[in-house]
Regions:
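Short alpha-helical
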Residues: 20, 49, 94, 115-116, ...
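Substrate-recognition/cap helix-loop segment adjacent to the acidic, metal-dependent catalytic center
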Residues: 30-32, 36, 53-62, 85, ...
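A metal-dependent, Asp-based hydrolase signature
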Residues: 48-80, 90, 97-98
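Structural recognition of alpha->loop->beta junctions
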Residues: 125-132, 194-211
Length: 214
């Protein structure tokens, strides 16, 4: 095998989380009398953490203190509703089982709240993901490479033996900043041009295609 570890993004890569994210965003917005956002708007807002998601979702020129209150409502609601509509993409479970059977270590590095990320990974992929790192105090979020370095240290794997898999420009830049290759996936929240423009080393159309590069 070329690599000893595969590090995955979560939203748009392993799981389709848009509906649960949209529902929690709209619940939070409704508590402040703000208009709802549609699925495509949420799709374009995700990738840079929940604070950025909420700040883009509230109306323009919303005072920061109101945005922060809306964020708190979102966090509480999403922590309790993160697995209602969310589901793994077809073929992901088969890929993770194949990696495990071949002794490849796996991890998730995501800008999602750490508690929600752990809940989703445990609910859908219990025993198939070795390490999960979401938003944690003291660990800079993507595209900074801190989360990648953290999981490599926990897994005991060097950068030369790891690859990152994601669906967005944030993932491509994260991999580049960490000094590891990036496999871009076509079933997520961004299109092929975004992945190419941001330097994905490989682009795949199906989850099992990832194994060909491992």
């Amino acid at each position: 095998m070329k690599y000893d570890a595969v590090i995955f993004d979560l939203d748009g890569t392993l799981t389709d989380t848009l509906e649960d994210l949209k529902n929690s965003v709209n619940y939070a917005l409704s508590q402040f009398g703000f208009p709802e956002r549609n699925t495509e708007e949420i799709r374009s807002f995700v990738g840079n953490g929940v604070k950025r998601l909420i700040y883009l979702s509230v109306p323009e020129n919303t005072p920061d203190e109101i945005s922060e209150s809306c964020l708190s409502v979102f966090r509480e609601h999403y922590n309790n509703h993160s697995c209602e509509k969310t589901k793994p993409y077809d073929g992901i479970a088969d890929l993770l089982k194949l990696l495990k059977d071949n002794g490849i270590k796996t991890a998730v590095v995501t800008n999602k709240m750490h508690s929600a990320a752990e809940d989703i990974v445990k609910y859908f992929f219990d025993g198939l993901i070795d390490v999960t790192v979401g938003q944690i105090d003291g660990v800079a979020q993507k595209p900074q490479p801190d989360g990648v370095y953290r999981v490599l240290d926990l897994l005991g794997v060097s950068r030369e033996k790891a690859v990152y898999v994601g669906d967005s420009e944030v993932d491509c830049i994260t991999a580049k900043n960490a000094g590891i290759p990036c496999i871009g996936v076509m079933w997520g929240f961004r299109d092929r041009d975004v992945l190419i423009k941001n330097g994905a080393d490989y682009i795949v159309d199906r989850p099992l295609d990832i194994f060909d590069y491992i």
